[in-house]
Amino acid sequence: MSTPSPADRHERAEQALGTAGVAYRPVGSAEAVTANSAWWDADADAYHATHGEFLGEADFVWCPEGLREADARLLGDVAGADVLEVGCGSAPCARWLTAQGARTVALDLSAGMLRHAREGNTRTGLYPALLRAGAEQLPLRDDSFDLACSAFGAVPFVASVDAVFAEVARVLRPGGRWVFAVTHPLRWIFPDDPGPNGLTATQPYFDRTPYVEVDEDGAATYVEYHRTVGDFVRALAAAGFRLVDLVEPEWPAGHTRTWGQWSPLRGKLFPGTAIFSAVLDP
């Protein structure tokens, strides 16, 4: 990921955290947790002011392309199921799942995001259980859930995707499904710009060095990790999952909304989202 375009700078969060520049360097789990927790706390209000209407109060939107679970049915029938959402943000997906009859637990690292989640629960009268926790160590019992999902939640922001997948496998029952959406790995090679400048490859696809925003002392204020498609497939297999589908949502006709690097211009040329659907083999 190259430096975000000026129109996509999260100015309030950057000012609060003292973000001064961008680096590509290794970042371990502890530093990433500290940076990203603080980042999403600082950005929570601005994020919801910008994207809250699009995401809805109790809707399950998988991605900026606007694919909804009500249409995609990637999770199947959730009525009566125990469902875990990893990286829930303000939890509109968890509230949608609850409205469909699921027993839902939603977790996030950010207290700021969970504040919005609690407020959303109160407004809608839908109350999925909310839990502040990281994805690399889930404070949940073994074999507790039938399904786990994440719509651009924790997966891009963790140092060890292997740890996340192993933890999800631990808390799922045999035969459970794990479905998660991430920025399509192909996007890593292009500048993070929704316009014409975002159409020329500048970053090597196989360079997995994390994208890091830093303060004046070089401490991380935001961290995002890149994995190739093959990296995700191998990590799923290592955790005991069998990949059953890989969805690359196409940009819908008439969809004019730009979200960061996602735009009609780029969306008609190459995918912006990858949704992995996997089953935990008994």
List PLM regions with ranges.
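Conserved class I S-adenosyl-L-methionine
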Residues: S2-A79, P92-C93, M113, R177-V212
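A short glycine-rich, Lys/Arg-flanked "PGG" loop and its adjoining helix->strand segment in the class I
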Residues: D162-R177
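Class I SAM-dependent methyltransferase SAM/SAH-binding core
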Residues: D82-Q137
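A short SAM/SAH-binding and catalytic strip from SAM-dependent methyltransferases
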Residues: D146-V161
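A short acidic, Gly/Pro-enriched loop at the edge of an enzyme's catalytic core
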Residues: E136-L147
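Short alpha-helix
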Residues: V212, V223-L246
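Acceptor-substrate binding/catalytic loop of class I
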Residues: V182-F190, E216-D231
